[in-house]
Amino acid sequence: MPSPLGPPCLPVMDPETTLEEPETARLRFRGFCYQEVAGPREALARLRELCCQWLQPEAHSKEQMLEMLVLEQFLGTLPPEIQAWVRGQRPGSPEEAAALVEGLQHDPGQLLGWITAHVLKQEVLPAAQKTEEPLGSPHPSGTVESPGEGPQDTRIEGSVQLSCSVKEEPNVDGQEVAPSSPPLAAQSPEGNHGHQEPASTSFHPPRIQEEWGLLDRSQKELYWDAMLEKYGTVVSLGLPPHQPEAQAQSELGMLLTGTGVCRSLRSGNESEGPPGCPEAQPPQGPGPAAWEGLSGAATPAPTVRPGTPPVPTQPTPAETRLEPAATPRKPYTCEQCGRGFDWKSVFVIHHRTHTSGPGVQSPGLATGESTEKPPQGEVAFPHHPRRSLTGPRSYPCEECGCSFSWKSQLVIHRKSHTGQRRHFCSDCGRAFDWKSQLVIHRKGHRPEVP
């Protein structure tokens, strides 16, 4: 039965709801769905309740609530990556949010570093950090139960954890560490649990960090420009990045292939390196008997009577997870080493490792067109102009000769030569580079309205 018509009434708020964080209340208000309630009047009442939890009219004045609404609308007009970065800084007023955006115009590296660390899931020059475990303490996933101590599901869960922990990890010296077998040591009569090699807590392996340090400044800038252009293309099309996190990690390993790194950063899978690369060979892991020992539930071998046909055995869940998954075909393939790439920008950077001079290019790179068609399911935009990464940078400075990839960088750089600030304050005479800074500055001269 619909509720009777009448003036809207503000719902009574609980004290616990009033004390919750404003950001959580804002997300609940903005993320409200009509399907959560039974009808339109219930939806309207729920929206009023969520709005009161966010704005808190009993604690804020009308001007403060207006500023909160203006700040929310201002952040909603920003591009997605800039909006996420500004929200992370938690601005308290619209002027503070505008000042943060202006700071990005002077120092675009802040936004690029945030995109690299949070969106592309790559840390900027991570430090090699390791956590050491006590020698006598057992690993949490190394506990092995006997067949009669617990149910079968517990033993299977333990085997999955152990199968995930046995993986080759490069140490500080760059040598491969063979997978250890702590369950075998745990079953020793002395009762020693054994220990594993300390796992690295850094995002990239130490070897990748060393190779990154060997790159010169131009190679690092070229890599950042390629990653920024790739991310900007995805954002401009309004599509989420379709590559998984492990694939984004592998592209940095492909970039460093020319300096000696043949192993990809793809977690759990090995890169497809050239035939002559010894690191691209699959590791020699333990056999089926060793994996049966790791599962903690040793099944006795069935007795076969003479004259009876062998019974086919079903693969265990642990063996099924060990089978390598089929890798999809990549649209850009290097003709010299056979390596495949999902992004043309990374393919262009990799191709430069094979060329002996700047004039050697593979077919299709000079014109900006790929030699192969895009995979099925992707949309090609032939009418969109694309900047070629093989040629020189297209925005040079007439004063010092420095070249820049983006025109905005050249505009900011030119102001360092002129030394002139075009926007002056008529009250105090201060000069500013941007008009928006002058507008914010002028508000400080106005008398505050009581």
Swiss-Prot record:
The keyword ATP-binding does not apply. GO terms for cellular component: chromatin; extracellular space; nucleus. GO terms for biological process: regulation of transcription by RNA polymerase II. Residues 287-306 have a biased composition (Low complexity). SUPFAM superfamilies: beta-beta-alpha zinc fingers (SSF57667), KRAB domain (Kruppel-associated box) (SSF109640), Retrovirus capsid dimerization domain-like (SSF47353). GO terms for molecular function: DNA-binding transcription factor activity, RNA polymerase II-specific; identical protein binding; RNA polymerase II cis-regulatory region sequence-specific DNA binding; zinc ion binding. A zinc finger (C2H2-type) spans 332-359, 395-422, 423-450. Residues 26-108 form the SCAN box domain. Its main location: nucleus. May be involved in transcriptional regulation. Belongs to the krueppel C2H2-type zinc-finger protein family. This is Zinc finger protein 446. It comes from Homo sapiens. The gene is ZNF446.
